[in-house]
Amino acid sequence: MRKKKTEVYALRRHISLSADKARRVIDQIRGRSYEETLMILELMPYRACSPISKLVYSAAANANSNMGSNKANLVISNAEVNEGTTRKKFKPRARGHCYPIKRRTCHITIGVKDISLDDEYEQIYSLKKPRWKNKYTTMIYHDIDSIGRVWDKK
């Protein structure tokens, strides 16, 4: 008996972006849930976030249409960045010289897994520690006059 397919991929090739810059963003979203991934990509200030978020949307749409899975059950299981082709141009310089310009491209693959269909992944996901710290700080009121005039000193 064949296993039911629980993972769906989305692939985008020849993105005009360096592979190292894309890996910086991909490493942050690997292993996270679909909603958490979209929030992270929305708030990160990098240029690589836009094509990666489009790929995450596409992978979720593929999972919805191919397997009929709910987007709340999706987890980014596989995310990889490979180097693509490098376009070479030449910039004309003084006295007949030219400097080479390399336009690097990359290929990004994102795999999305439905955790409701996979029993083994549910057990691992329940044991996983959260990545944020559960530290709560309390606000303490300080009386400024009792401390002294700190701002008057030069």
Curated annotation (Swiss-Prot):
It is found in: Plastid, Chloroplast. It comes from the Eukaryota. GO terms for cellular component: chloroplast; large ribosomal subunit. One of its GO terms (biological process) is translation. Pfam families: Ribosomal_L22 (PF00237). Belongs to the universal ribosomal protein uL22 family. This protein binds specifically to 23S rRNA. The globular domain of the protein is located near the polypeptide exit tunnel on the outside of the subunit, while an extended beta-hairpin is found that lines the wall of the exit tunnel in the center of the 70S ribosome. This is Large ribosomal subunit protein uL22c. It comes from Jasminum nudiflorum. The gene is rpl22.
